[in-house]
Design a protein with these regions (language model features):
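Glycine-rich helix-loop-beta junction characteristic of Rossmann-like nucleotide cofactor-binding loops
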Residues: 1-4
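Class I SAM-dependent methyltransferase SAM/SAH-binding core
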Residues: 18-64
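A short SAM/SAH-binding and catalytic strip from SAM-dependent methyltransferases
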Residues: 71-87
């Protein structure tokens, strides 16, 4: 998306702002939203450290559309499918369409259920910034459940995070995006532009 044509970008579910900040560094005017106040505060801190004035971060539910339109909306790293009710996830896409300018582009990066079901790693552990982490994953009722636990000398007690994501396939997205008013331009299997396949 050239900056000259897609100046204003919304990062939907921005977390700690990793992608928002990269986009801002490339010259886009970026708004990042996330429900986590802690994540947004961290994103603001990093943006300030990098002296970026073309990015703002807001604590906001992705189901609640902003009262403005953007040239582009990005939803990256499977930041979708969090809600138990399918209708709520559909509403996220409908509201995303409302926030797009007439010639705007929506880019969504989402897992491939076929690949996940075949290659799910039930557990793993390692080190991250002097902390030990343990991750467990399971598939149940059409969702992936992930638990991440951090422990280490710098923590008073182990910190645990839980995530769940719906296993929506490509056909589901085609139907729901079409019903929401989107026209699908391309579907890729990776960031290099490879075709989407069952093993992507």
């Amino acid at each position: 998306m050239p900056v000259s044509s897609y100046r204003n970008i919304l990062d939907l579910g921005c977390g700690r702002g990793r992608h928002s900040i990269t986009l801002a560094q490339r010259g886009y005017q970026v708004t990042g939203i996330d429900l986590s106040k802690k994540a947004i505060n961290k994103a603001k801190q990093v943006a300030k450290q990098k002296d970026l004035h073309n990015v703002q971060f807001l604590v906001r539910d992705m189901r609640d559309p902003l009262p403005k339109q953007f040239d582009g909306v990005v939803n990256l790293f499977t930041t979708f499918g969090y809600f138990l009710e399918d209708e709520e996830n559909r509403n996220v896409l409908r509201n995303t369409k409302k926030m797009l300018a007439k010639e705007g582009v929506f880019f969504i990066d989402y897992l491939n259920p076929q690949y996940v079901e075949k290659n799910l790693v039930p557990s793993e552990s390692g080190m991250y910034e002097n902390l030990t982490y343990n991750v467990t994953r399971k598939i149940k009722d059409g969702m992936v459940f992930k638990t991440i636990q951090f422990s280490g000398d710098s923590l008073d007690k182990p910190v645990k995070y839980r995530e769940r994501v719906k296993l929506y396939g490509l056909e589901w997205f085609r139907d729901v995006l079409g019903d929401s008013g989107f026209k699908i331009i391309e579907t890729y299997g990776n960031y290099d532009g490879a075709p989407f396949l069952a093993e992507s």
